[in-house]
Design a protein with these regions (language model features):
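Juxtamembrane boundary at the C-terminal end of a transmembrane helix
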Residues: 305-311
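Transmembrane helix-loop-helix
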Residues: 53-58, 101-147, 235-286
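Central hydrophobic cores of alpha-helical transmembrane segments in multi-pass inner-membrane proteins
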Residues: 40, 44, 62-74, 108, ...
Length: 311
């Protein structure tokens, strides 16, 4: 950490503008602002796939929910950060703990209020997803029942973290919009859009966990990389990416999804090849890693926006 700090001082002296930009980006990723933007962008992609109108309040609902859940889960999983070799991020969390609480509670309340304003069903979707997210690290099963269930917390279930993250993102991104919009969408589009969001957010969660194996093992957080190991996890991610791209191509060719599916499938494959060829076997620094996975979703949202605008 001392060497890292010295390198940062050298970079700041050599290029103060770049150092300032990196500090801003570090704050945005540490506070999960970029994660919220990525989630909102992905929700827009889901709306385009379903052929539904997308409004600002839907974007804000997803943005606030995802950003709040990521921040609040840092308080329910205390002790994880000290196992990560990420001194800059640890310093942000240590110095700005009150701000973190505010950035968790206020957006969480905003997502609940927005869900309520959109209607009964959107409110219930957000409420249920929020309760499950907050209960993830809480001991919900009494100790005396441990022998019957085999677990006390939801996070004790094998690979539970990745499944819960993907399910929450997909549920909040798809169903509030589906329940509110008056236009009808085909059941096949609803199902395929949900599967698309579930898979891409699941891949994101798994890929991030590959670099946090040591911390997850120490705190007992069950993830796919811990269950399968790094080698088999990489194989699983490759299979999911290729399968998702092929599925999008087929769905577009059969008319089950609109033409944007062609573009999304190609974008996913290009991103996959970029990661395989450029970063194979190399661990990315935390800032670059988080920015890369979030920008992947943000660019997908921009592609969907341009496609709809031109169409």
């Amino acid at each position: 950490r001392v060497m890292t700090h010295l390198r940062e001082l050298e970079e700041a002296d050599a290029n103060p503008v770049l150092a300032r930009v990196k500090r801003v980006l570090e704050a945005l990723t540490s506070l999960h602002i970029t994660t919220g933007l990525a989630a909102g962008s992905l929700a827009y992609v889901g709306a385009v796939l379903m052929g539904l109108h997308f409004r600002l309040d839907f974007f804000l609902l997803v943005f606030f929910y995802v950003q709040a859940m990521h921040v609040l889960n840092r308080f329910t999983e205390t002790g994880v950060d000290k196992f990560r070799d990420d001194p800059k991020r640890q310093e942000i969390y240590r110095r700005h703990r009150i701000i973190l609480w505010v950035l968790g509670i206020v957006p969480f309340a905003a997502s609940i209020v927005l869900g309520f304003m959109l209607g009964v069903w959107p409110f219930l979707v957000v409420l249920i997803a929020s309760i499950l997210g907050l209960l993830y690290s809480v001991k919900v099963v009494p100790k005396s029942w441990m022998g019957l269930f085999g677990f006390r917390r939801l996070k004790d279930l094998a690979a539970s973290k990745n499944v819960f993250v993907a399910s929450a993102w997909a549920l909040v991104s798809i169903f509030p919009l589906f329940f509110v919009e008056e236009q009808t969408t085909q059941p096949s589009r609803l199902l395929l859009s949900f599967v698309f969001l579930f898979v891409v957010t699941g891949i994101r969660s798994i890929w991030l966990d590959l670099s946090d194996l040591a911390a997850d093992r120490l705190v007992g957080r069950e993830t796919v990389p811990l269950v399968l190991g790094p080698t088999r996890t990489h194989s699983l991610v490759r299979t999911l990416i290729v399968g998702l791209s092929v599925g999008l191509y087929l769905a577009a060719a059969l008319g089950w999804l609109p033409g944007i599916a062609w573009i999304l499938a190609t974008w996913i494959l290009l991103e996959f090849l970029y990661l395989e060829l450029l970063y194979r076997g190399n661990a990315l620094p935390t800032l670059e890693r988080d920015m890369l996975v979030d920008l992947h979703f943000i660019v997908a949202g921009l592609l969907a926006f341009v496609w709809r605008a031109l169409g």
